[in-house]
Amino acid sequence: LYLNPIFEAASNHRYDTADYETVDPLLGDEQDFRTLCTEAEKRGIRVMLDGVFNHTGAKSRYFNADGFYPAPGAAQGPISPYYLWYSFHPFPTDYDAWWGIKNLPAVNERNESYVNYIITGENSIVRRWLRAGASAWRLDVADELPDEFIFAIRAVMQQDFPDAYLLGEVWEDGTTKVAYSKRRRYLLGGGLHGLMNYPFRTALLPYLAGTSGAEDFRDAMETIRENYPSPAFYGAMNFLSTHDTPRLLTLLGCEQPPADRDARAHYRLSPAERERGTALLKLAALVLYAFPGSPTVYYGDEAGMEGFEDPFNRRTYPWGHEDTALLDWFRTLGRLRAERESLQSGDIAYPLAAGRVLCFARRAGDEVSLCAVNAGAESASVDLPWAAPLAHDALSGQSFLAEGGRLHITLAPYDALLLTE
């Protein structure tokens, strides 16, 4: 269960941390968090926290731009113990900030005091919240953190919490990433365990939208597979939407996105757009659950939530108004993923990837699962290798007879199969 930032902050998104030691009272308190982690673990669920360590909020106990906190912050000058966490040019009006956004002053991650506070101290932020029950950290803007900072977090986690997981937010291929003129090393061992797999979404969306072919998706994913260490590829955080992207249902359904921001704020798909978008979203979800990696669902996607960019993609969950058919689809995919070892850890091969048709097979030992997707508006006939005499579609319950080690199947428009032996 990946939570966006939970710590006290001035905004509702909380990427402008005000106090790393305090849960935002809008959400509850530390005891509530501990209870959540305890009850989640009883149900086989672990909690991952969002670590925003590249910058703080200007309205924070550390910077204290508005003087809200009684103790001096960096904005009050060298009297503050946090003054050297930030870089002023000159004090007090000009300072380094994340992408120049002044309410997000950037910290110096090489400052010894800051590293001790966040990572290495006996009661550091990393240690404190893992002791409180968290099982993982997701590092916000990981490619803007020094490699040494990431390695230090991993070392502390490995020492005190060897089962804890360290995930990084990187939007590109993490093995070829260059940031601030330096090739990043966080996937070479001793750094991040894995990454958010934005390349998966970046390749899947145009295939489903019809602006690229299945072969383009295959090629993009094979590049990632070739470049990534195997644990990072097979454990990548795959997703369809995040808090930083428009919801996939809206992107796939909307025929002509409004240019005006206010229009996007109030936009709702027409019945025809929603029907098409839902059909494509179901295909996307199937690929998500059948593909190597860890399928991750942004809250509400499974219920049919719509929304363009932030903040329109962050509305409240539609309690009592969910798309129940879509919910059932996601539940079915989750059950199949849990039941089939091939979908969890199997190797991948592509017997067919051309145009609107994407077929990939997962194999673990003697178990095979083959995902066949037609993202086109017309029927498609496919000819696939199949060793067993019969193929069973785990989605519809249909069975197909193989002839001479081949399956000859027609896929309806916007249709898919998950074939098992």
Locate each region found by the language model.
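Hydrophobic faces of well-ordered beta-strands that scaffold small-molecule active sites
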Residues: L1-L3, V47-L49, W137, L166-G168, ...
